[in-house]
């Protein structure tokens, strides 16, 4: 909600070719999508690819999800919100294929932190006859980093829970009180208000 420049553009296909993708810092044009006239056929092909259950050649679901992301971002069919939609479809496809852990990965944060590398992977793919190996490689690394972030988060939360549980053994205190005792234990000079 409230992520588009103009909320009336939600879900609307482009009706012209007055669109370019710019680097948010330098404002350099990094991508000019194909003509809006190609959008109707693209949508048919895109939906066929997305929903293909019996392909002639196997494409691993993670790779297919990345290709879905690339296809939508490359075509840029919507007036606004193409990047967010591409990432959302990637997540949705992964969940549809049974990769439930994807729901807990923050790939968007990794892309945000490495926006220039993300854009370069796109540019290299375009410059090399749409060889999306660059984009796939970037996204696999982003998935790996996101997974490591999730592992570290779980490790921190598990350790915090373990420490709080130790203080719960004191008796006659609840979990919130145990957390406060833990804060004082770890930082004796901490001032809580």
Show the residue positions of the predicted features.
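FIC/Doc superfamily catalytic core
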Residues: 1-193
């Amino acid at each position: 909600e409230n992520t588009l420049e103009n909320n009336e553009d939600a879900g609307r296909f482009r009706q012209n070719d007055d669109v370019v993708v710019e680097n948010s810092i330098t404002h350099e044009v990094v991508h000019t999508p194909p003509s809006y006239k190609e959008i109707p056929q693209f949508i048919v092909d895109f939906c066929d690819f997305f929903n293909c259950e019996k392909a002639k050649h196997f494409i691993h679901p993670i790779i297919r999800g990345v290709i879905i992301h690339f296809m939508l971002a490359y075509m840029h069919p919507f007036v606004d919100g193409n990047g967010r939609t591409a990432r959302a479809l990637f997540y949705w496809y992964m969940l549809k294929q049974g990769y439930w852990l994807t729901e807990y990965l923050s790939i968007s944060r990794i892309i945000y932190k490495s926006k220039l590398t993300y854009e370069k992977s796109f540019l290299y793919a375009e410059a090399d006859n749409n060889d999306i190996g660059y984009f796939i490689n970037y996204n696999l690394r982003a998935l790996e980093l996101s997974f490591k972030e999730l592992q570290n988060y779980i490790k921190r939360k598990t350790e915090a829970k373990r420490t709080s549980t130790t203080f719960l053994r004191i008796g006659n205190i609840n979990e919130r009180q145990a957390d406060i005792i833990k804060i004082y234990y770890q930082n004796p000079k901490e001032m809580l208000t």
